[in-house]
Amino acid sequence: MAKHSKKYREAAERIDRNNLYTPEEAIALLKSMPAYNFDQTVEAVLRLNVDPRKADQLVRGSVNLPNGTGKTAKVLVFARGPKATEALEAGADIVGDDDLVEKVANGFLDFDSVVATPDMMGKVGRLGRVLGPRGLMPNPKTGTVTMDVTKAIKDIKGGKVDFRVDKNGNLSFLFGKLSFSAEALDQNFRAVADEVKRLKPATVKGRYITKATISSTMNPGIPVDPASI
């Protein structure tokens, strides 16, 4: 078992494991923890009372964070002709069609988000095994399969985050950097959490969010009271 660093252990000691924190309290606690020499990413994980094997309980969506993500995403676009030109003009980092599909199939993964025009999905579909597990597969529900490539690229570059519940019912998302103000982080967290709640499947009975944690890159997860979300 790997040994944790002194800073990690110090951070862990500050967390009361018998307590469930509000999101605001968890964020404040994170910001009080020992500093590192880089700007950590802040993340949340929500455990949902859903069965992702059922199509009507596969919770997924996207949100434009009110205060951005703190990083500029590298966007890859699958498009041809005029739409490829439009994508480049809109700020896409990598644009291509069949050759790019082949490149990704062979292991190229130097990008953060993927957009595709509908006519490319016949070819892009075979990348499911590569892109799917990484949460990168384009999907109309998240606005990443579209003819409006300009809007999709601008949204992603402007701080859009996609989320999807995994096979175990966990839904994770990034919502900023530790250097953000506590208020900005809370606003970002609430924006995603509110959208997740809005997407609650009608067939789910009882409590929807059953467990939650907030953490940052180098710090342990802080337990959050689902009732406070």
Curated annotation (Swiss-Prot):
Q: Which InterPro entries match?
A: Ribosom_uL1_bac-type, Ribosomal_uL1, Ribosomal_uL1-like, Ribosomal_uL1/biogenesis, Ribosomal_uL1_3-a/b-sand, Ribosomal_uL1_CS
User: Recorded GO terms, molecular function?
Assistant: rRNA binding; structural constituent of ribosome; tRNA binding
What are the alphabetically sorted keywords of the record? Repressor, Ribonucleoprotein, Ribosomal protein, RNA-binding, rRNA-binding, Translation regulation, tRNA-binding
Q: Which GO terms describe its cellular component?
A: large ribosomal subunit
Which Gene3D superfamilies does the UniProt entry name for this protein? 3.30.190.20, 3.40.50.790
Transmembrane stretches, by residue range?
A: none
Q: Give the UniProt record's GO annotations in the biological process aspect.
A: regulation of translation; translation
Xref: CDD domains: Ribosomal_L1
Pfam families for this protein: Ribosomal_L1
Its domain of life?
Answer: Bacteria
Give each disulfide bond as a residue pair: none
The yes or no answer to whether the keyword Repressor is present is yes
Q: How does it assemble?
A: Part of the 50S ribosomal subunit.
User: Which family does the similarity line name?
Assistant: Belongs to the universal ribosomal protein uL1 family.
Q: What NCBIfam families is this protein classified in?
A: rplA_bact
Q: What does this protein do?
A: Binds directly to 23S rRNA. The L1 stalk is quite mobile in the ribosome, and is involved in E site tRNA release. Protein L1 is also a translational repressor protein, it controls the translation of the L11 operon by binding to its mRNA.
The protein's name is Large ribosomal subunit protein uL1
* Gene that encodes the chain: rplA
